[in-house]
């Protein structure tokens, strides 16, 4: 192997991105053509695979949390993909059911939404919530039942949080899959959720997956953002994620649950 080839091989081991693919004549090696086809199929599957809401509910309930399963106004996947606006609104019967279940005001509502990758929420939602629970306990925050929604967009959390009288809502949603990331989970935090909030009023934690941000790291960031959001009364472009500064401070490693002092 030549020096440039060896360099590309070493770089390729550090990222799932499609780099250093090599050549076979004027085209790509057969191995890379097959890998591309597999990645494309995995991305399509991530978008079109139905979310197993009941299975997710069981995994969340195993953590000791109550759940509610709801639906958006998109009746099926085809409509959801063609009409994003339907995915941002609760079905009337789901809105009524949540309203009946709403209790006293809470600090946080959590919505698990399939988004564009059911695989991401199947694999990542419960581990993220489990990693976040020690932060919840330490801060003394009270939670609404975890809501699970099919055919859902980020903005559906605004209605959910408003109905449940939450000071903030965190939407755990499957992100649009790429050719190397069909399993990426995103977290969108919004203070004062209500219909009509814009994306500029949200904070996003992206790329939560085995090859990206770990559940523990994502939970740490969410804890920092939520604490600051509740203190300052805002989220979005006016709230910058400075959790890394806190983590770099002396003794900050103890802020990660399970970290040794």
Task: Describe each model-derived feature in a short phrase.
Residues 175-184, 188-261:
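C-terminal functional extensions of proteins
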Residues 60-62, 100-104, 161-165, 179-181, ...:
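Solvent-exposed alpha-helices and their adjacent loops that cap or buttress functional pockets
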Residues 118-140:
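Glycine-rich phosphate/diphosphate-binding loop of Rossmann-like nucleotide-binding domains
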Residues 134-182:
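A contiguous pocket-lining binding segment that forms or flanks enzyme active sites
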Residues 107-120, 170-172, 206:
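Short glycine-rich or small-residue beta-strand-to-loop segments that form or flank ligand, phosphate
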Residues 51, 65, 123, 127, ...:
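Conserved active-site and cofactor/substrate-binding residues in soluble primary-metabolism enzymes
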Residues 1-85, 95, 245-248:
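Active-site loop/lid in soluble adenylation, ligation, and acyl-transfer enzymes
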Residues 76, 115-120, 152-153, 176-179:
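Gly/Ser/Thr-rich loops at beta-strand to alpha-helix junctions
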């Amino acid at each position: 192997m030549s020096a440039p080839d060896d360099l590309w091989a070493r770089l390729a081991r550090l990222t799932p991105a499609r780099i250093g693919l090599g050549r076979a004549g004027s085209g790509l090696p057969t191995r890379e053509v097959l890998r591309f086809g597999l990645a494309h199929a995995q991305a399509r599957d991530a978008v079109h695979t139905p979310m197993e809401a009941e299975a997710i509910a069981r995994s969340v309930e195993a953590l000791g949390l109550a759940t509610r399963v709801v639906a958006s106004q998109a009746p099926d996947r085809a409509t959801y993909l063609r009409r994003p606006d339907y995915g941002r609104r609760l079905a009337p019967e789901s809105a009524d059911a949540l309203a009946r279940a709403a209790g006293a005001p809470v600090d946080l509502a959590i919505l698990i939404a399939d988004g564009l990758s059911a695989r991401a929420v199947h694999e990542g939602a419960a581990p993220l919530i489990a990693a976040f629970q020690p932060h919840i306990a330490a801060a003394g925050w009270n939670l609404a039942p975890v809501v699970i929604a099919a055919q859902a967009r980020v903005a559906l959390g605004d209605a959910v949080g408003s109905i449940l009288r939450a000071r903030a809502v965190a939407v755990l949603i499957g992100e649009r899959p790429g050719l190397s990331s069909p399993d990426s989970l995103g977290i969108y935090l919004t203070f004062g959720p209500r219909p009509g909030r814009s994306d500029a009023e949200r904070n996003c934690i992206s790329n939560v997956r085995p090859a990206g941000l770990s559940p523990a790291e994502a939970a740490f960031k969410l804890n920092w953002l939520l604490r600051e959001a509740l203190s300052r009364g805002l989220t979005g472009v006016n709230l910058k994620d400075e959790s890394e500064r806190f983590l770099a401070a002396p003794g900050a490693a103890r802020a990660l649950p399970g970290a040794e002092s």
